[in-house]
């Protein structure tokens, strides 16, 4: 019997893929409408995304097969959804991020900020969180976590070594950093945790160090997820939202762009980051704030040890190269162009220099990202000069460009590009089949629920759902439904879509919830219960912070207090009874 269950478990992915479509067949066979056919496709894809029986990107290709066969959309129209302006923004933004990562500019920024902030326990946590969050705004959460963790563990090793030396009356002879792999770090952590000590003070110190290492690990992975919400390109769900809004509401006049998103999400990120720092400090360092800020016994030696580790790593980077300076300049230029293209509170360069006959900008954030990334393929990584090829003496060799296609091809997550397209295809299929309207009609009773309560409940639901499945899949499934619901109850669509998009990044409780959590967990020293305990309250804090932001400073940015004309549908009751306000208190 045991062997039978083991065989079923081993082949579970194959069984799910084969049985799931058959199990769901009664829906399209009994209810033979386009709405039912589209619902069948969405439910099938949702379950495959949740179980990951197939790779996420492979499941995202299903609409190309199912929609034409079921008469929902023509194949040519479905395929157009897989490469839209949002996908271009994703590719361009990631190419710039790859250049930053390739030339180690992110590491220089991280170490420089840590040297400025200092290494007292509480400030060390804050420093790592600020740096990780800032980097995660521009490069992938996974890459940021993978880079910051080895730095954090090197500092922790030196802190532990310094503490032992202080207790034994020795000096710490060397602060030279020893690079170690995650496996080696895990072994050291495990050994440090299991070692038997002869005195209670030493055991207490070992326990304190272990708690501090847990806190630092969680600070890094949590701040990577939090930092990603601040910019439109910071994490993929943000781009999913922009793409869904542009697809479902084509007349929205580019309401979600880099500048408007930053004005909404950056303050939210800062507040959530500071609250997360306070919570993790209390949970892992205790409430002895005098000691946490480095005024306890022996803290000066520990501080010097940690500072020396960071200083050594920073020195090993050497002076900034020409490539780093060029990438820095282009990166700053990219951000400036993004902010000034269509800022909203004054005419941007996109509205004035590149406007069509209607006065609308003909360029997008994706145009800017591709422009900057193309420049990186042109500028050489060294100052042009006469240098010989070391392999062929006497033959001149030109330096490679700042960005090469090999580097991009190796580091670009092409699967996410397909996943984005699959989400846009689902949204378009829901609209074409009439499923969106059907769902909206069924959700009209929600108009009797206060809007702020609706946002709170939906954000909690998404935050729970994203713990079990990909945040991209979560937003892809929820956003079209939320858009239909908002139209049905005459609520500004962004009032529910924005908070639920941010809630999809609140994956704090489980190692499998998001790659940064998995990376931290694989380093060792953490149990699932540790992450769940820290992440549970942080999820609650996150949802409350998002609810605060959507009911305060977000209202003037997106004009959430009125139902927009671009959200009207032909059958909407809002045409007959236009609401004066969609937000409580306005």
Swiss-Prot record:
Disruption phenotype: Deficient mice display increased urinary excretion of citrate, alpha-ketoglutarate, fumarate, and malate and a modest increase in succinate. Despite the increased excretion, there is no significant change in plasma citrate concentration. No other phenotypic change is identified in these mice. Transporter deficiency do not affect renal function under normal physiological conditions, nor to response to renal injury. PROSITE patterns: NA_SULFATE (PS01271). The chain crosses the membrane at residues 13-33, 53-73, 86-106, 215-235, 264-284, 319-339, 366-386, 407-427, 445-465, 478-498, 506-526, 535-555. Residues 165-209 are annotated as: Disordered. InterPro entries: Na/sul_symport_CS, SLC13A/DASS. The keyword Phosphoprotein does not apply. It is a multi-pass membrane protein. Li(+) decreases succinate transport in the presence of Na(+), by competing at one of the three cation binding sites. One of its GO terms (cellular component) is apical plasma membrane. It is found in: Apical cell membrane. GO terms for molecular function: alpha-ketoglutarate transmembrane transporter activity; fumarate transmembrane transporter activity; sodium:dicarboxylate symporter activity; succinate transmembrane transporter activity. It catalyses: succinate(out) + 3 Na(+)(out) = succinate(in) + 3 Na(+)(in); fumarate(out) + 3 Na(+)(out) = fumarate(in) + 3 Na(+)(in); 2-oxoglutarate(out) + 3 Na(+)(out) = 2-oxoglutarate(in) + 3 Na(+)(in). Highly expressed in kidney and small intestine. Not detectable in brain, heart, stomach and skeletal muscle. It holds the Pfam family Na_sulph_symp. Keywords: Cell membrane, Ion transport, Membrane, Sodium, Sodium transport, Symport, Transmembrane, Transmembrane helix, Transport. Residues 165-175 have a biased composition (Polar residues). Belongs to the SLC13A/DASS transporter (TC 2.A.47) family. NADC subfamily. Low-affinity sodium-dicarboxylate cotransporter, that mediates the entry of citric acid cycle intermediates, such as succinate, citrate, fumarate and alpha-ketoglutarate (2-oxoglutarate) into the small intestine and renal proximal tubule. Can transport citrate in a Na(+)-dependent manner, recognizing the divalent form of citrate rather than the trivalent form which is normally found in blood. Transports the dicarboxylate into the cell with a probable stoichiometry of 3 Na(+) for 1 divalent dicarboxylate, rendering the process electrogenic. Has a critical role in renal dicarboxylate transport. This is Solute carrier family 13 member 2. It comes from Mus musculus. The gene is Slc13a2.
């Amino acid at each position: 019997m045991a062997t039978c269950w083991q065989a079923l478990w081993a082949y579970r992915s194959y069984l799910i893929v084969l049985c799931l479509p058959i199990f769901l067949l009664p829906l399209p066979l009994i209810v033979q409408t386009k709405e039912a056919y589209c619902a069948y496709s969405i439910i099938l894809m949702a379950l495959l995304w949740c179980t990951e029986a197939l790779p996420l990107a492979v499941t995202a290709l299903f609409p190309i097969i199912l929609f034409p066969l079921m008469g929902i959309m023509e194949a040519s129209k479905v395929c157009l959804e897989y490469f839209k302006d949002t996908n271009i923004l994703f590719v361009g933004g990631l190419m710039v991020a790859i250049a930053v990562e390739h030339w180690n500019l992110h590491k220089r920024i991280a170490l420089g900020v840590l040297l400025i902030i200092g290494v007292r326990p509480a400030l060390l946590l804050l420093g790592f969180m600020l740096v990780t969050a800032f980097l995660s705004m521009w490069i992938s959460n996974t890459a940021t976590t993978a880079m910051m963790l080895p730095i954090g563990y090197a500092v922790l090793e030196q802190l532990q070594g310094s503490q032992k030396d202080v207790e034994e009356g020795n000096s710490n002879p060397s602060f030279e950093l020893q690079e170690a792999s995650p496996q080696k770090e895990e072994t050291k952590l495990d050994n440090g945790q299991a070692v038997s000590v002869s005195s209670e003070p030493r055991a207490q110190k070992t326990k304190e160090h272990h708690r501090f290492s847990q806190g630092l690990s969680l600070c890094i992975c949590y701040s990577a997820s939090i930092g990603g919400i601040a910019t439109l390109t910071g994490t993929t769900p943000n781009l999913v939202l922009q793409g869904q809004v542009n697809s479902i509401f084509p007349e929205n006049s580019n309401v979600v762009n880099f500048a408007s998103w930053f004005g909404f999400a950056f303050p939210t990120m800062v507040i959530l980051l500071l609250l997360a720092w306070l919570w993790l400090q209390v949970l892992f360092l205790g409430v002895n704030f005098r000691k946490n800020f480095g005024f306890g016994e022996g803290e000066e030696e520990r501080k010097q040890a940690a500072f020396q580790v960071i200083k050594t790593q920073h020195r090993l980077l050497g002076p900034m190269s020409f490539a780093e300076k060029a990438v820095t300049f282009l990166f700053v230029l990219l951000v400036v162009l993004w902010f000034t293209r269509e800022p909203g509170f004054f005419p941007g360069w996109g509205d004035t220099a590149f406007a069509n006959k209607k006065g609308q900008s003909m360029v997008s954030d994706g145009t800017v990202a591709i422009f900057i990334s193309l420049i990186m393929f042109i500028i050489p990584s060294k100052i042009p000069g006469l240098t010989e090829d070391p392999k062929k003496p006497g033959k001149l060799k030109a330096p490679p460009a700042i960005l090469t296609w090999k580097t991009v091809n190796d580091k670009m997550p092409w699967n996410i590009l397909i996943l984005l397209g699959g989400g846009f295809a689902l949204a378009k299929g829901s609209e074409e089949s009439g499923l969106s309207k059907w769902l909206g009609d069924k959700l009209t009773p929600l108009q009797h629920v206060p809007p702020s309560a609706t946002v709170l409940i939906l954000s909690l639901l998404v935050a729970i759902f994203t713990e079990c499945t990909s945040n991209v899949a979560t937003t892809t499934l929820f956003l079209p439904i939320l858009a239909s619901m908002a139209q049905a109850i005459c609520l500004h669509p962004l009032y529910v879509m924005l908070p639920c998009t941010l809630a999809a990044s609140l994956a704090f409780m489980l190692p499998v919830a998001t790659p940064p959590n998995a990376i931290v967990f694989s380093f060792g020293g953490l149990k699932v219960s540790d992450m769940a305990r820290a992440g549970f309250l942080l999820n609650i804090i996150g949802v409350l912070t998002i609810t605060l932001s959507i009911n305060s400073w977000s209202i003037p940015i997106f004009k959430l207090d009125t139902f927009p004309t671009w959200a009207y549908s032909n059958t909407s009751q809002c045409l007959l009874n236009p609401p004066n306000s969609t937000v409580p208190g306005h």
